[in-house]
Amino acid sequence: MGLSDGEWQLVLTVWGKVEADLAGHGQEVLIRLFKNHPETLEKFDKFKNLKSEDEMKGSDDLKKHGNTVLSALGGILKKKGQHEAELKPLAQSHATKHKIPVKYLEFISEAIIQVLQSKHPGDFGADAQGAMSKALELFRNDMAAKYKELGFHG
C-alpha cells in the first residue's frame, strides 16, 4: 500500500502549490466538504451557523481552520508514510475529543482531490491524482488503526 519515491514526489510537488496559500486552499476544501456532505458541519460548533457558501467564504474562522487542517496534513504527507509521531496526537483528538468518523476523513479526502483538480489542473494530472489518492488512503487507514487502538469505532 506504500507509495513509490516517484509517487511521493508527485504528491509533494502539488503540495508545494497548496502551501503557497494554505488558508485559501483549506477554506475551499472545507466549503466543498460542507456542501457535498452537510452532515459533517454538525461536528464543527464554530461553523454550524454558516448556512450559505457566501457566509462560509466570509468566515475568518473557517479560513483559519482550513489553514490548520492543511498544515497538519502537509506535515504528515512530508513524512512519506513515516508519520507515526504526527498521526498519534491527531488521531487522539479526532477520536476522543471531536469524535470524527473515518468516513468523514474519506469525505475530506475527496474534497482535497476536487480542490486540487480545480485549482491546479496543470500540476494535478492522472498520475498526481492517483498518487495523492494513495497518500490520503494511507493516512486514513493509519488514522483508522489509531482510532481502533483508542477504542473509537467511528
Swiss-Prot record:
Transmembrane segments: none annotated. Heme b binds at H94. O2 binds at H65. Nitrite binds at H65. Pfam families: Globin. Keywords: Cytoplasm, Heme, Iron, Metal-binding, Muscle protein, Oxidoreductase, Oxygen transport, Phosphoprotein, Transport. Monomeric. This is Myoglobin. It comes from Ochotona curzoniae.
